[in-house]
Amino acid sequence: ALSAADAGLLAQSWAPVFANSDANGASFLVALFTQFPESANFFNDFKGKSLADIQASPKLRDVSSRIFARLNEFVSNAADAGKMGSMLQQFATEHAGFGVGSAQFQNVRSMFPGFVASLSAPAADAAWNSLFGLIISALQSAGK
């Protein structure tokens, strides 16, 4: 779990991003796939598709809304060690089953603070780094 201070910073940073989660979620995936094109292949709906096709896909909002809902759960429970432990274990098991591992989340960790900043949300780079560090550690523990 994160410290109460880091959890508070995350909540402040995340609130304006999640407030417009449909548009921002889609923008996040487009930014991820622009910086790391191979990431799209981990999503059945986007595998082998061009960025233009992904942007035009009605599935973009469906997928991004699921991602943002899960991220919202992590942000909302970031200071609760018990909840975070079980959530991270479930998340890692699910993602290992999809073939998604720590390397993919290293990519997300490297670009997410900049994505948040691009939306003029309050910076919380160290707190985001810590949250994604927990996710990466859980994936490594799951063998990914």
UniProtKB/Swiss-Prot annotation:
Statement: the UniProt record of this protein carries the keyword Cytoplasm: no
Disulfide pattern: none
Parts forming coiled coils: none
Pfam families to which the protein is assigned, alphabetical: Globin
Entry binding sites for heme b: H95
Protein name in UniProt: Globin
Note: This molluscan globin lacks one of the heme-binding histidine residues found in most other globins.
Subunit-level organization: Monomer.
One example GO MF annotation: oxygen carrier activity
Keywords for the protein's UniProt record, in alphabetical order: Acetylation, Heme, Iron, Metal-binding, Muscle protein, Oxygen transport, Transport
One CC-aspect GO term: hemoglobin complex
Transmembrane parts of this sequence: none
Modified residues (N-acetylalanine): A1
Family, per entry: Belongs to the globin family.
UniProt cross-references to Gene3D superfamilies, sorted A to Z: Globins
SUPFAM superfamilies per record: Globin-like
Domain of life: Eukaryota
Domain (Globin) ranges: 1-144
